[in-house]
Curated annotation (Swiss-Prot):
InterPro entries in the cross-refs: LytB/IspH
Chain sites annotated for binding isopentenyl diphosphate: H50, H83, H133, S231, S232, N233, S276
EC numbers for this chain: 1.17.7.4
This protein's name: 4-hydroxy-3-methylbut-2-enyl diphosphate reductase
Sequence similarity: Belongs to the IspH family.
Residues engaged in binding dimethylallyl diphosphate: H50, H83, H133, S231, S232, N233, S276
EC top class named in words: oxidoreductase
The organism's place on the tree of life at top rank: Bacteria
Lineage, highest ranks first: Bacteria, Bacillati, Actinomycetota, Actinomycetes, Acidothermales
Segments of this protein annotated with the region Disordered: 320-340
Organism this protein belongs to: Acidothermus cellulolyticus (strain ATCC 43068 / DSM 8971 / 11B)
GO MF annotation, one: 4-hydroxy-3-methylbut-2-enyl diphosphate reductase activity
UniProt entry keywords in alphabetical sequence: 4Fe-4S, Iron, Iron-sulfur, Isoprene biosynthesis, Metal-binding, Oxidoreductase
């Protein structure tokens, strides 16, 4: 009697890079450093980053999250989120005599600068992004009369401009790289003189995480993306995984949201996380999988990240005035290694 061939070994393919990017690390450090310097409460307009666990942890330390600056008591400290804000928010904060600490990601600030420069040149700006996303709202506020939102290739087919020879494009930093390229292709076909931004607006971390998930999706039966549902870059990772060959892909905030039925007939599970996800949540998912026989973990490298952003100038000035070192609480790599 012929013996049946051995079953494949259950394994996990772990994407690298994953989790915190430099902008998120800086934003979280900003709130923590403000709490350390000034003591609680420190107010934060909007979620500092789009992850409910990070927000809850900062709330436990004394941060108070509000939707708008007019909810902050006059004269208080307010941190502005990593996603950026419109100029009107700075004015509102000034009128309320708030001490503002700007945690906007420097890569988002770059897009704001490009929007102002294009508008000053009299160009019409087609902003590729998702309506009502905080980053899009902030960028649009830099030049509201010059910006038209374009949400994907289909809208690009129908958007109207005043002068096709005077059009530029920008994009939200957390979009699908492939879909953004498709959208730009449509715009360039319709407006051949379309002006590009000086450099790619989609951030390095978004691109790297999408490249990594493409590699694991091509050989995984299932891809689990750790991230909150309001995180644009996390949601895009699910889309990229499905487009890149994964039979199934799901977004979970943590291991408690995994459905055991997803593992039926699955031998290889890919795991990654969005740019606002602490490594401890990924560790929890790996432990959950290990309990179910997926205890072999192979890290799949797409890119090694070393970028670190300095703290906002408001905090650096305060630290200097107090004679304290201009240090960050930890780098993303330090936190990742500590969690693991």
């Amino acid at each position: 009697m012929t013996e049946a061939p051995p079953l494949p070994k259950r394994r996990v393919l772990l994407a690298q890079p994953r989790g915190y990017c430099a902008g998120v690390e800086r934003a979280v450090d900003t709130v923590e450093k403000a709490l350390e310097l000034y003591g609680p409460p420190v107010y934060v307009r909007k979620q500092i980053v789009h992850n409910k666990h990070v927000v809850a942890e900062l709330e436990a330390k004394g941060a108070i999250f509000v939707e708008e600056a007019d909810e902050v008591p006059e004269g208080s400290i307010v941190v502005l989120s990593a996603h950026g804000v419109a100029p009107s928010v700075y004015e509102q904060a000034r009128q309320r005599r708030l001490k503002t600490i700007d945690a906007t990601c420097p890569l988002v600030t770059k897009v704001h600068q490009e929007a102002r420069r294009f508008a000053e040149q009299g160009l019409e700006i087609l902003l590729i992004g998702h309506a009502n996303h905080e980053e899009v709202v902030g960028t649009t506020g830099e030049a509201p009369s010059s910006i038209t939102l374009v949400d994907g290739p289909e809208e690009a087919e129908h958007v109207q401009v005043k002068d096709p020879s005077r059009v530029a494009w920008l994009s939200q930093t957390t979009l699908s790289v492939d879909e953004t390229l498709q959208t730009v292709e449509v715009l360039r076909r319709r407006f051949p003189q379309l002006i590009d931004p000086p450099s790619d607006d989609i951030c390095y971390a978004t691109q790297n995480r999408q490249a990594a998930v493409k590699r694991i999706a091509a050989i995984a039966d299932l891809v689990i993306v750790v991230g909150s549902r309001n995180s644009s870059n996390s949601a895009r990772l699910v889309e990229v995984a499905l487009d890149s060959g994964a039979k199934a892909s799901y977004l979970v905030d943590d291991a408690s949201e995994i459905d055991e039925r997803w593992l039926d007939g699955v031998w290889t599970v890919g795991v990654t996380s969005g740019a606002s996800v602490p490594e401890s949540l990924v560790t929890g998912v790996l432990a959950w999988l290990a309990e179910r026989g997926f205890d072999t973990v192979e890290e799949i490298d797409a890119e090694r990240e070393t970028l670190v952003f300095a703290l906002p100038p408001e905090l650096r000035r305060e630290l200097k005035a107090r004679g304290e070192p201009l240090t960050r609480s930890a780098t993303a790599g330090d936190r990742m290694n500590a969690d693991r």
